[in-house]
Amino acid sequence: MAVHQYTVALFLAVALVAGPAASYAADLGYGPATPAAPAAGYTPATPAAPAEAAPAGKATTEEQKLIEKINAGFKAALAAAAGVQPADKYRTFVATFGAASNKAFAEGLSGEPKGAAESSSKAALTSKLDAAYKLAYKTAEGATPEAKYDAYVATLSEALRIIAGTLEVHAVKPAAEEVKVIPAGELQVIEKVDAAFKVAATAANAAPANDKFTVFEAAFNDAIKASTGGAYESYKFIPALEAAVKQAYAATVATAPEVKYTVFETALKKAITAMSEAQKAAKPAAAATATATAAVGAATGAATAATGGYKV
């Protein structure tokens, strides 16, 4: 449908602007409207208490400048929807936001890409946001005209809040800058971890939505153990990866299997990318030929140091 054309714009707008612990719809003062003549069986949701709006005008990168424009379009769409009859809110929102977001993207994405790392990061984020959008859109399917808009915005707002929890709100930094210190042992096995991640992602993509999380986690751990000769039992023995997952979960309570998988995979991908970038910057050119031997030794030593950790 036409709504799908604006998926990326909508999610990018909120994921980098809204705070991790606040509903975006609440930030805008949005509360589901009460229809003048409610349809049979329809009970509007209780309006959320408006939260303090996120500070504006803090864009420091081209990406954030684009976000501010899209964010303004999103607010305009909510305002437009608030002025029409309940049955017309959903259609009005889509039309208004679609025009604004298309204009913002035309202006903001006209320049050349800044680099492969940024392009890869945007592609990964787009994929996760698209999955969350589908979850929100599915929730609104089959609803009465009066309820569809409320269901769509409420579910979308919660999905965006979860995604925002995995991102840094007012700064878009290169992945390597987000990693403070990574032990040498972890850096030297990152290529194996990256390969294991790809194996797990492939397995999860073929699984039903409700099974993606368990399939991914099991496949990821098995691949890590196999590729390191048993030195690492699971991702939980690699502190940087475990910390990334814990940080993602700390921002929200991911109960739906689809959402849990999205949060989990996004956190791991972000950590692996950061570790990979740090490895490239830290590895001396003269030591390149010794990487394979060093990786085996580091993996064995790290496994010994990990005694007392826990297995899945």
Curated annotation (Swiss-Prot):
InterPro entries assigned to the protein according to its UniProt record, in alphabetical order: Poa_pIX/Phl_pVI, Pollen_allergen/Os
GO CC, any one term: extracellular region
Cellular compartments annotated: Secreted
Span of the signal peptide: 1-25
Pfam families: Pollen_allerg_2
Alphabetical UniProt keywords: Allergen, Secreted, Signal
Keyword Signal tagged: yes
Source species, domain of life: Eukaryota
Family of this protein: Belongs to the Poa p IX/Phl p VI allergen family.
Protein name, as recorded: Pollen allergen Phl p 5.0101
Species: Phleum pratense (Common timothy)
Classification lineage: Eukaryota, Viridiplantae, Streptophyta, Embryophyta, Tracheophyta
